[in-house]
């Protein structure tokens, strides 16, 4: 069930679902697994807010375990495509593809709440049962290319070398807010709506 907010206006009462009300304040919620439907909704909101006023920041709140690489990269590409700055605020966690999205916010405007976590790792893939050897080789090559592309984005976002990202992402690499700040994925830690 999605909560409803009722506001008093000069014309009377107006009710909004909570996400529409947040959108009115240029806030987008990116929560749950990254998949095509969620990505399409986030992309549509980014495009709408940019078309409405590209001189005002967009606030993207992130709490996701990650998910689809293609859906996540569609969000990242849109964030980079639009003119409005995108502030990212991580609450809960930004893991896997969520880290790529959250760290792709406008430099200087990437934030994290004090008890949130970041996690990077190499992309996962599979071929399913009954796959021919040739198809398995194609899938493996694609997975390696995808890993390199994600490592390049993460390296740019954190100011690290691709080699360092490759090493750290070999296995699940969890970071606290302080560790994420030191690593370079965020610019500041937010506490009580103020920067730390």
UniProtKB/Swiss-Prot annotation:
Superkingdom as given in the UniProt entry: Bacteria
SUPFAM superfamilies (UniProt xref): ClpP/crotonase
Keywords linked to the UniProt accession: Cytoplasm, Hydrolase, Protease, Serine protease
Recorded catalytic activity of this chain's protein: Hydrolysis of proteins to small peptides in the presence of ATP and magnesium. alpha-casein is the usual test substrate. In the absence of ATP, only oligopeptides shorter than five residues are hydrolyzed (such as succinyl-Leu-Tyr-|-NHMec, and Leu-Tyr-Leu-|-Tyr-Trp, in which cleavage of the -Tyr-|-Leu- and -Tyr-|-Trp bonds also occurs)
UniProt-annotated location(s): Cytoplasm
Pfam families for the chain: CLP_protease
Main location: cytoplasm
A GO CC annotation given for this chain: endopeptidase Clp complex
Family annotation (InterPro entries): ClpP, ClpP/crotonase-like_dom_sf, ClpP/TepA, ClpP_His_AS, ClpP_Ser_AS
Gene Ontology biological-process entries: protein quality control for misfolded or incompletely synthesized proteins
CDD domains reported for this sequence: S14_ClpP_2
Enzyme's top EC category: hydrolase
PROSITE patterns: CLP_PROTEASE_HIS (PS00382), CLP_PROTEASE_SER (PS00381)
Residue numbers annotated as active site: 96, 121
GO molecular function: ATP-dependent peptidase activity; ATPase binding; serine-type endopeptidase activity
EC number(s) from the headed UniProt entry: 3.4.21.92
Family from the record: Belongs to the peptidase S14 family.
NCBIfam families: PRK00277.1 (NF001368), PRK12553.1 (NF009205)
Reported function: Cleaves peptides in various proteins in a process that requires ATP hydrolysis. Has a chymotrypsin-like activity. Plays a major role in the degradation of misfolded proteins.
Subunit: Fourteen ClpP subunits assemble into 2 heptameric rings which stack back to back to give a disk-like structure with a central cavity, resembling the structure of eukaryotic proteasomes.
Name of the protein in its database record: ATP-dependent Clp protease proteolytic subunit
Organism encoding this protein: Streptococcus pyogenes serotype M1
